């Protein structure tokens, strides 16, 4: 199932499944539920969020996740540590479009030069950099190593 970015902006996963004829609606809904239920936060990432928050950092979510996945993540206690969020399915714009970064900066009064954007897609990092935001690529194949790198970069040495 391939959707243009424009279409993705306007829908959630459940909406996109409405056009799938190859699988009965109930099966698609079950697949969606199981896909979401199998997800869990990456443990090193959870701890990094806690460490950064304890060090006084302001933390924000900038995400292209669907409404269903964002609603799922909001149930985890660690999500409550974030100071705000800009989520594409609620905004009608997606990364790497410059407007979504501008909304994050404007909504929360962030200085691009003092903002670090962590993402798993080089195109999203490049789009942020074009607006003066520093970036760090997150490597899902080595989450602990990426979190350690960020800890060394951002937290004072003990």
Residue spans of the language-model regions?
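Short, basic/glycine-rich phosphate-binding loops at helix/coil junctions
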Residues: 16-31, 84-85
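Hydrophobic alpha-helical core bundles mediating ligand binding, dimerization, or RNAP-core interactions
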Residues: 14-17, 31-35, 69, 73
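Amphipathic coiled-coil/heptad-repeat helices and related helical stalk/stem segments
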Residues: 41-45, 71, 121
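Short, acidic loop-to-helix structural element flanking the phosphoryl-transfer center
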Residues: 25-60, 98
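Asp-based, Mg2+/Mn2+-dependent phosphohydrolase catalytic module
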Residues: 66-67, 73-158
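Single conserved hydrophobic/aromatic residue that forms the stacking wall/gate
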Residues: 1-9, 13-15
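Generic structural signal for small/hydrophobic residues in well-ordered secondary structure
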Residues: 7-8, 52, 61, 85, ...
């Amino acid at each position: 199932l391939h959707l243009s970015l424009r279409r993705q902006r306007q829908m959630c996963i459940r909406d996109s499944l409405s056009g799938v004829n190859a699988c009965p609606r109930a099966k698609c809904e079950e697949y969606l539920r199981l896909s979401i239920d199998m997800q869990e936060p990456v443990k090193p990432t959870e701890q990094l969020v806690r460490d950064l928050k304890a060090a006084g950092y302001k933390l924000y979510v900038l995400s292209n996740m669907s409404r269903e996945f964002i609603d799922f993540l909001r149930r985890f206690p660690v999500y409550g540590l974030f100071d705000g969020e800009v989520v594409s399915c609620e905004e009608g714009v997606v990364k790497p479009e410059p407007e979504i970064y501008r909304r994050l900066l404007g909504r929360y009064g962030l200085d691009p030069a003092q903002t670090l954007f962590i993402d798993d897609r080089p195109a999203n990092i490049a789009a942020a950099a074009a607006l003066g935001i520093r970036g760090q690529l997150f490597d899902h194949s080595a989450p602990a190593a990426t979190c350690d790198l960020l800890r060394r970069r951002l937290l004072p040495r003990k």
